[in-house]
Amino acid sequence: DKDRPGYDYTAFFARSGLMADLAPAGGVPLIPVGGIGDHSVAVALAGGIAASLFKRERTGEGEKVDVSLLQSATFIGCTGVLNGFNGRKLPRDRYDCGHAGSNTYQGSDGEWFYLAVIDYRRFPEFCQVIGLPEIASDPRFNTVDAYYKNKAELTHIFDKKFAEHPVSYWHELLEEHDLPHEILRHFKDVPDDPQVQANHYMYPYEYKDGTKTVFSNGPVHFSSIDPAEIPCKISGPIGRDTAQVLEELGYTQAEIAAMYENKEIR
């Protein structure tokens, strides 16, 4: 299939199972945003290049580094691939997740958060904190086996409880007791996230016409470089360096001018 046309939507998301099996059962397939597959490949390729340069430094031998969208997707989604290979029915809905302590829940404000009380030993404490102490001793949930077996029923109970207050209320309560969770943020919220700002994960940028935007920083920080001091520069308009590159390749200015006139380049 090396000659087939494709994008990260097709080769990364559709071909790998991510698009079909990450979305809830009974609904439409996952609708990804562009570039996730491309960025995943870029990170993998950077690591491969670094490793091959290290090998060349040590042995004098080079490497041809190859990374594909499908290969990166099967690596990222390997847990799902193994689940499917071993007979796990996918996609699944919220009531068929691993257990009720690791699931998404909706507050009264319509927003969602992810509950990650994965350790069953904290289940009684969690029930006490959210105001359902009787659940911890309920025969349907008071053993590990029963807890997993009756996960759908318990999820419905939690659904009703968490619908009593907005997500911010539950966030503060769970945070106070150091119970793992996270609010489901929206993309629009990310640039204002205090953690993102403190670590310079994104850069604000203003174009010459006054338009403001943000750019994502790379996912790796080096101790010798202060991310706050890294300048954010844009690449410029398409074709900005075309003439320079052609000159470096040996074309004359007259030949380049003819290419522009014939609309062979821009």
Set out the residue ranges of the language-model regions.
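Short acidic-hydrophobic surface loop/beta-edge motif
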Residues: N103-S108, M202-K208
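Conserved PLP cofactor-binding pocket of PLP-dependent enzymes
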Residues: E175-N199
